[in-house]
């Protein structure tokens, strides 16, 4: 005997098949291509309606996740049968879960059975009495919307997509600002080259251009709102003796247009930075307290979402952002990187070279806990107290490693050390009295004598070794010289013999 379990928007349907090996057929689509053939092959054995729309959503989610709900378990256990029957289901995970229940069913869920379910769902209204096509479509649409809302879990306060986009835009703005500022300095530098050396701030440079215009207006222009008094005097003095060339009004107009862009971009960047800071404190307050807004936002953007990042282990968080270096190290069998984006965190920056890796590991472990607290905690806490308390622990660990008191930014106040007033040391006049040299030798400690003897022995040994090395070197050099002399002598003898032969 074969049964087919069909999940609908209205409820669970258990269909009894006339052919118990129907699911093994290779021509299913041809055998079940009309409503009459489907109705002839399958009869409704049991049908369990859902109590409400919320109940339908709960059951649908259970099927998607591969869980057997209490309703489905009760529905299947009430089927009376003598022999073990075959149960065809559409979801493989659900089939495995039903098998574990130990019911009197042999569960089948494979690629071939999908054609069977496709044919049944196509002609489902004909099989289920009291359900017309329009009613079933409306139920399916309503359930689809409910599942969509459930998956999205939309919340105005927990939208981490805003953070991902904001940090990406912030990086783009920084690049644009740097490019525009460089272009503006090079452009206006032809007219007033000395200004770029005195004013390093790009926004202040652009505001001076907008306020002053050409350098001849410097003496009449008030720059007190942009620069301090001393710097203002320097700029005005430099403008009078500038080595720059003259520019036309059209040139100045275009330079001013670029300067306006720089000022506007800088103002928008500050606004975006404040927005990102507020969003981070709302979405991940504990992570923000631990690593800061920018590093936290970059970590979330790199992982894709706060939930994905919260599920990552501490080891992954530690090297997040250093994937290229990691895979290169694994490929070449070298040491793997110790830190990625966390390298720019203030706590890692305070550590010296040898301790950076240790602090990065500690910080990653604490960040993993803070992330889970932010993302998965049932109780909402925007204060970030947990993050500040964890940061204090990391700071104390850093202080222990560095051997010095580190500057803290946490809310946890350290206990102030009690100031002990000690008596000032007095001059000891008796220490001036010196004894004879013989007495001093007698009073010398035995430990010092031992050290001195060891030192003397070591020096003698080193001298002996040096002497032996020198003797060996001299012998070798002498031997080489003798060999060379012998060679020269033999050559000379040969030459003289040859000359004698030639004379003869």
UniProtKB/Swiss-Prot annotation:
The keyword Coiled coil applies. One of its GO terms (molecular function) is snRNA binding. Signal peptide: none annotated. Residues 405-504 are annotated as: Disordered. Residues 405-423 have a biased composition (Basic and acidic residues). Residues 451-478, 489-504 have a biased composition (Basic residues). Its main location: nucleus. Required for pre-18S rRNA processing. May bind microtubules. Belongs to the NOP5/NOP56 family. This is Nucleolar protein 58. It comes from Meyerozyma guilliermondii (strain ATCC 6260 / CBS 566 / DSM 6381 / JCM 1539 / NBRC 10279 / NRRL Y-324) (Yeast).
